[in-house]
Structures are given as C-alpha cells and as structure tokens.
C-alpha cells in the first residue's frame, strides 16, 4: 500500500476480506450463480490460472468467477479494470447485471506482459507471473537484479512475442515519454527516441543491439520503481512485510 501510494496519494484500499464479510455478499454470489450456467462458469476458470478440467476436481473453484463478479457489484464499480485474462469474469459480471437488474459495469482490459522466458504476450500460460521468479520483474528488485533478469530475457529479432519490447510499449514509453538508451561512446554513444515506434524500428533494423535494449530497459524500470522502494525502505517494518509477502 505504501509503495502504491507514492504514485496514487489518497487512494482508498478495499481488500477481499473487507468484501466477503459484508452484508449480503454471499447472497449475491448465489444470485450471480443462478443467473449463469455451469458451462459459463467453467469457461471463466481461466481467470484464476486454471483450465476447464480443474473444475471437475474441486467444486469450490466454480464459486470464484461468481465471487469476482460480486466483488464488482460490492464495490459499486463503474469500471472493471484488469488484464485480458480477466475478461471472462468481467463479461460474466456484465451479463449477470442485466438479469439481476444491476448497473452494468464497463470492462477495460490491458494487454498481458509476456514472461521474460518467452513467448507469447496474449497466452495466459506465458504471462509474467511471480510464480516464475526468473521470468518476472518484481517491484522490490534492485537495479542489479533487474539487469541480470533482463540480460537473460527472451528477445527475438522480431516484434511478435517479444517481452522486452512489450515492456517499452505498454509500460515505459507511456510513463517516461522520451526514451534514452545509454551506450558507451565506443559503441556509438546514447540513443534517444521520441516514440516507441522509433525504438521498435531501430531494434528490428538491427541498429539497436539486444543487450543495449535490455540494459536500457533495466535502467528505465529502476527509474520508475526507485521512488517506491525508497518510500518503503523508510519504514523497515513495512519493507520486511513486503518482502515476506511476495516470496
């Protein structure tokens, strides 16, 4: 919370624990379930990293999509924001809202960042996840660790399925604007790009070396997360709790 508040001061947090103990929560879970079908719930299991077969092993998994839809109603959310892997839950919430005469939330989905291990950005099985420590970037990673992880990242000489270019297109360029790739003078000196498209073009043409791209990515990422790390480190107790929670 402390890290997030660096960029969003004044934000209010609601945890799942706050919601599930609220009045009428579980009644709404049952109402959403009744407004849907077993087939629809089975399709939505992918939102929790499961496939449709997993539902046959454990009945409780079928409650999760209905709970996620109920969360949206409990928050009185006008907008449901999530990765593309959450679209089944959001569509369930929209469809059930019609049947239950509830306000219909707008669903906004962001692209998934691909695992550094490669490939594919839109494949939920290959998305960046903390369950794969070498394939993901964490908010508490030092600059040295970011550089090490990215140095081993899958970075093919094309755009499709390139997780390093994904990071620039969907995260770094929108946050930083002007793009600077630092290079030693003996290798041509620093490169500056005023748009992601020009960075991509330079990489695909071969004028930007993969290692330079990776090192520049690590430096830019650290520029963004450093203020959050410094804020959290100013409260050692919170920082220790963060590290233990994400291991």
Q: What are the language-model segments listed below?
A:
Residues 1-109:
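Divalent-metal (Mg2+/Mn2+/Ca2+)-assisted nucleotide/phosphate chemistry catalytic cores
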Residues 69, 87-247:
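Conserved nucleotide- and phosphate/pyrophosphate-binding catalytic cores
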